[in-house]
A protein has these predicted regions:
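Hydrophobic/aromatic-rich structural module bridging two neighboring secondary-structure elements via a short loop
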Residues: 1-39
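Structured surface interface patches that mediate subunit assembly and partner/cofactor docking
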Residues: 2-6, 31, 38-149
């Protein structure tokens, strides 16, 4: 999966699957699931947590696009935030302390850490948007220029 998360990789996926109907996409996912199921129990930490973070992030993207909220207090959201906290604890202890002591919901923290909140939105939540923004360069995430949700 060379180039995964790059714009070129994303565009290649759109070109490959963009003409499929929702039913055809569901069938494709259905045939792929057993392959993942057969190996997922062997995924080590932190890869498995990253896998969960990615899945729940895209689930929430779809929910937002469809206007169907839900799953905001799920174990998957907790695991996704935990994935980031493990990284931030080492790289930025003050931000780690802020994120683990705030009253901001885990869902809003996840959406902030995955590029679904502007700095202004993060600040309005009571988070240090500028400090969070410093973690985006070199990651697969980028800050939106305009409010996403």
């Amino acid at each position: 999966m060379e180039g995964v998360t790059t714009d070129a990789w994303t565009q290649a996926q759109v070109e490959l699957h963009g003409r499929l109907t929702l039913s055809e996409l569901a069938d494709l996912f259905e045939t792929s699931a057993p392959k993942i199921d057969a190996i997922i129990h062997n995924f080590p930490q932190p890869i498995i947590s990253q896998f969960v973070m990615d899945a729940v992030t895209h689930e929430q993207d779809m929910r937002s696009a469809l206007g169907v909220p839900g799953g905001r207090d799920s174990k998957a959201v907790e695991v996704g935030v935990g994935f980031f906290l493990n990284l931030i604890e080492v790289s930025d202890p003050p931000l780690f302390n802020e994120l683990t002591s705030t009253s901001v919901s885990q869902w809003d923290i996840l959406r902030s850490l995955t590029g679904r909140r502007t700095v202004k939105q993060m600040n309005a939540l009571g988070l240090d948007g500028e400090a969070i923004a410093l973690h985006f360069p070199g990651s697969p995430f980028s800050l939106p220029k305009e409010a996403v949700e």
